[in-house]
Structures are given as C-alpha cells and as structure tokens.
Amino acid sequence: MKSIELIDIESIASDRAGITREDGVIELLSEADEALGRRPYPSSPTIRSTEANIDESIGNRQLWLQSIELNGEFQEDDSEEVEETIGKKPDDALVCSDACSAPDVSIQELLQTFTPPKPHAGRVMKAGAGPVRGSSRQTSSKLQTKDVLQDILVELDDNLSSWDTPSTSGIRSPETVATLAAKWANKTEKTSGKPLYGRPRSSGNRGNILLKRTLANRNNILSSELGGESSPSLQALTTPLPAKSNDGDKNQTTNVMTTGGFRLGTMEKQTLNGSACVDRIQQVPVSSPESVSFLEGLSDIPISKPVQLTQRCIAATNTGYTKDNCASTPRSAAAVEYLEPIDTDTSILSTAGEALPHSPVKPSKVSRERSKRDYIVHSKAFTAEESKAKIRQLMSNTALKKQFNEVNKVTREKQSLLAEIVLSINEQVHQYLLEQKVPIAEVLGPTTVIHNFESVPIIRFKRKCTSMYDLNNDIYYPCETTMCNEPICLLFYNAVDFFTKYKNQKQRLYSEVQDLKRAGNKVIIILNEYSRLEKSLAELENRCMRSRVEQQLTGDKSPRRKTVKEVQLTALEMNSKDLGRKVNEMIIKCDIDIFPINSAASFANWISNLVWVVAKMRYDPMMKNVNWSHINVKIGKTPTEVLSKTLQQINGVTEIRAGRVTSTYPSFQQIFTDFEKGYLVAGKDGNPLMTKVAEKAMNALLMSEDPEEQIYIN
C-alpha cells in the first residue's frame, strides 16, 4: 500500500515539477499540489474540533469508535491502491463524485497549526508509520498514524449523531472503518473472505432492493416497500423460507445488517419450550491495529438503542411468486408482496361441547349413537339379528306390515308432522299471551297446546311418537303411542322481569339454566319487549339529566314524584348500554341462546317456525346421518363461490370478508398451495386476509391428517 503524504510548502511555479528533500522525506511536487491546497483529498474526514479538545481527549482515553462521519466516496472505497497524482492535472470529477460533498477546509488549517502531544509511556513511535504533514512555516513534526486517527475520532457526540442521522451519502457500514485504519496504519493485509459482519459490498450498482416477503401487519417495524439508491432507511434482511419444522431445530439465527439506529451484530432467536423466545444481540469483534478490538472501550459511550426483531418481523425476498421457483399464485413484479407465516396453534379453537378441538382419540360408535339419540327421540340401537327378527315379525301380519310401511315413508306431510308436537306452556305465560290477544293455540294449528305449572316460565316441546327408530339400521318400527320430550325448551321472560331477576337473583337464574342443561335440553331464553326497555332506559337517563340541569339553574331541589315504571327502571341500576353487555355475559357463561323480541305477536310468529323445525327434525335425513350430511350439498356454482360460502361458515367471517379472501385466492387449490408453504398473501392494503381464528380453522381444515379432528366453524 502506498502512503499518501500531504505536504504543504510555499512552492513557486518553478518548483512544481521538481523534487526536493526535507528531513529525509522525499517530497513529490506537481500541479496536483495546487489543487490539494484548494481542496483536500476526498477521503479526508471532517474534523470539527479544537486543539484543546484534541489534547484533552488524547490524554484521557484511547478510542476506537464504532462509527465516524466520513465522506461517502471514501466509505465506498475498499481498495488499497491509490492512483499516482504525479504529472496529472487537477480534475474535480476524479477527486470527488457527485454523491459526496467536499469536506471542510478547516482540517488543513488545523493540521498546519497543530502540534502533536508527546507519546504516552510504553508507546513505540515508528518513523514513517502514517501520513506526515510537512510545513515550511512551522516546525516539521510528523503525526503518527494512531495519533491522527485518534484525533479524527475524538469528537464523539458529533460522530455518533452522524451514524443515527440519515444522510445523502448512501448506506454506510462500519466495516469501512476497519479498512480505513488498515490503510492509515500502512497495513497490506487483504480480506479475501466474507466481511466480518454486515452484507458483502458489491462493486456494481446497488439497484432498487425490494423486500418481497414481509408480514401483513400494519404495526410492522419494517416499511411496506424499501428501495431506492438514496433511501436512508434501507434494511437488508435475509432469512430462508420456513420449511416444515423439525423437533431438533429449535434455534434460528439470522444475520442482520441495518442502518438508522440498529446495532450491528448477530440476532439469535432461541425458543424455550416452544412458547417463549429470547432475542439476543451479540457484537462481532472487528480487527484493528495492534489487535485492539474495534468496539473495545465503548461501554461508557451512549449509543442508539437496538431494535430487536422477533421471528414474525423477519421478511424473505421473492421475485414474482409466493414461493421461489413455484408457479402458483403469480404476482406482479412491480408490486411488493406481503406474506405472513401461518400460526398453526389451534389451542384457541373450541367446539360446542367440552371436547378438545383436536382430540387424538377417535370417538367410539357408542358416542356417535348418543349424539344421534340427542336429536332423534324414542330411538334404540338394534343389532343385526334383532333387526331381522323385528322385520320378520312385522312382515308376517298385514296390519303390522301396513304400519311398518307408514312409519318408514320417505316424504311426510307438514300437517301430520305438526300434529305429533305437543307444546307445554307455563300457565302464567299462557295467560300473558291471552292478555296480549295472541291465541297461541290457534296460531300453532294442528299442534297440541297444554299447560304446566312449573315455577319457571318454561315452554317444553313434546312429541307423540308412534314408532321407534333403529340407530344402526336407519329403520322405524311401529309401536304404541308414546309421549317423549324433545331436547329443547324455552324460557319466556319480559325484559324488565328478566333483568330484575338477573340483578337480585343471579345465582338462582344460573342454577335454573344449568339444571335444564344437565337434563340434556337446549335452552333458549326469550326476552319480550327488549327494545322497549332499551328505549325506556334511554328516556329515563335523559329525564334525569334534564332534572339535574334544571335544579342547578333554578335552585329548586324539591323531589319530583316518580311513576311506578320509573321506580322499577331506577331499581335496575342499569343504563341502555348495559343491557347488551349483560346479555352477552349470560350467553358466554351459560352457553345458551338469547333472542330479544319486540312484542307477543312477534313471539307467536317466531315460535310457529320453531315448532315446524322441531317437528321435522326426527325424520330429517341430515339428522339421521350427521356424519355424511355434507355429501351432495351444493353451496355454489363456481369454485370461487364454493370457497366463499365455506369461509362464511366460520364464525366472524362475513360475505365481505370472504370476498376479500377470494379476490386473492379464487379456489381451494390456490389457498391450499400457500397453506402448504406456511405463508398467506396479505391484501392490497397490507393487512391480513383473515383473522387468526379463521386462519387456524382453515389450516386445520386443509392440513389436518386426522379424519376425526374437530374444526371450529360456528
């Protein structure tokens, strides 16, 4: 490596082409010296300090700083060769590029008047070890390499601020500082391998670097599109696509090189027991003169707080498809794709019962029969021999054969089905409906209405069964008329009475509901005049507010007489917004359904539809073959419509949200392909296409290998 010696002497025109000697140092003088007098060498660092600060700093500590403010052209220069300037004319284009600006001229004035301090004890000074500045006006003193470098790096606050503050000099990496130190120390070692840290430097044009794979999260610390030669916040993150996870691979290491406040180093993500992770930043040692660590002595130096990136914040590059070298789901090359790793943890998914969503144990035949028996009353599981004997007995008699054919008809009339249902209504509820001029018996038609005198306002469904159902052979056998209870019941409350009981007798209300559920009933609570109560509470709030304002204005504090209704509403100690919250609390805690209705007439219309559903439930082929009820069910005409209808069955996925998914994945095949890769493409706005619950449900639906695995739908 050739040493460049800056010599400042009072030369004349006749000496510009000559060679002189001073103190044993050969001085090369040419026309370029005049240019050097006007404009310093482009690699000269900018020093904004005084002589007193340099003396005090050199005397107190020895510094090898992490970053300094250098001109962009010198930082981009990694070569150790310098063109000879003898006999060349000064050319600004060769001295400095357009991307960098000339340093301050104050560096020459400082070096002209600066007298280096005496070396510290134990330090060996070698002649010719670094750049020398000769002066004809002052004593010719030679600054050693380490002293010059320490003088340049002494301004800690200014230099560190230049590292955190984006500039127009391009992307800067501290790896050039080590090369700079090697240059000035007159070292000839060359790094043939990869750089010690950061991204390897390319000699060509950087080009626009786009992060093709990032997370579909608006709160992501990475910008949606990073690129451009002058982008100060450019971050290069490289990580392999997550393949199928192995049990042995629990540590993932990602090399990160960032600018603008990120600390250089190696980020290691360690998973502890598969649940918690620890991000650890380790500093990489850098070679420096005399084997001094480049980052040594920086423990007391304030530096920017590092940003620790978790695994969800790591993006992988891609060039046109959702996975490299895969021809599925093509994307536009000009657009940036956002891919989010799929979380396959289905622990948050739940089913209607208490069974685990992913039970590894295959449900037994008895459990399937029990679930079928819950919907088909008066049923029994007959063996093959028992069924043959029963059929042989029925076919031997003409009357029994006629009854056997009658109970096994495929199509049944609506009136005959409604005639099988018996509605047991609480006496108080029946009287209330009559007071509201709702003749429930006439509304229900062929359905029989009877009264019960239970302590709760309950409505039970019963069925007059003339046959027994064989759960194993799907056959009805004629029998004597038997009254059976259907697994469904209603609790009819006026909204005011319900919330009064909820406030004063909450535990009793919960106990009544749980007793009905333990008996195998599906409990539905009807809240009559719910909207009327909501409006009454809102009006009461307005009257109370108006009364308080009038009292403050007039000073009249005489109590106003309240009506019975106002007293009842005031005793609830609720406002109009509390009603919905109380209803949701009851639904979640008791696992029941609550239907608010406006009037008794609306209830009559609603219960007539419910009676028809209960009446045909025992003979519905879907209920008799629950495990195969999905066969031959067409929910759409096109693959996109089928996918949309399937997504809408997931809780919380509306038609609009399903359309958001189908706009990116028009068919099951395309979304299945990306589920196999472990990533899903985000929407055009950068947000996820589905919620976490919907994503987990779809992942279990498409990727599960267990045919008995349960999926949360609704």
Curated annotation (Swiss-Prot):
Q: Which domain of life is it from?
A: Eukaryota
Compartment(s) of residence: Nucleus
Q: Which cofactor does it need?
A: Mg(2+)
- Family annotation (Pfam families): ERCC4
Identify the GO cellular component terms for this protein: Holliday junction resolvase complex; nucleus
Q: Which keywords does UniProt give here? A: DNA damage, DNA recombination, DNA repair, Endonuclease, Hydrolase, Magnesium, Meiosis, Metal-binding, Nuclease, Nucleus
Q: Where is the composition biased (Low complexity)?
A: 223-234
Q: What is its main location?
A: nucleus
Keyword Nucleus tagged: yes
Q: How does it assemble?
A: Interacts with MUS81.
Q: Family assignment?
A: Belongs to the EME1/MMS4 family.
Function statement? Interacts with MUS81 to form a DNA structure-specific endonuclease with substrate preference for branched DNA structures with a 5'-end at the branch nick. Typical substrates include 3'-flap structures, D-loops, replication forks and nicked Holliday junctions. May be required in mitosis for the processing of stalled or collapsed replication fork intermediates. May be required in meiosis for the repair of meiosis-specific double strand breaks subsequent to single-end invasion (SEI).
Q: What is this protein called?
A: Crossover junction endonuclease EME1
The organism is Eremothecium gossypii (strain ATCC 10895 / CBS 109.51 / FGSC 9923 / NRRL Y-1056)
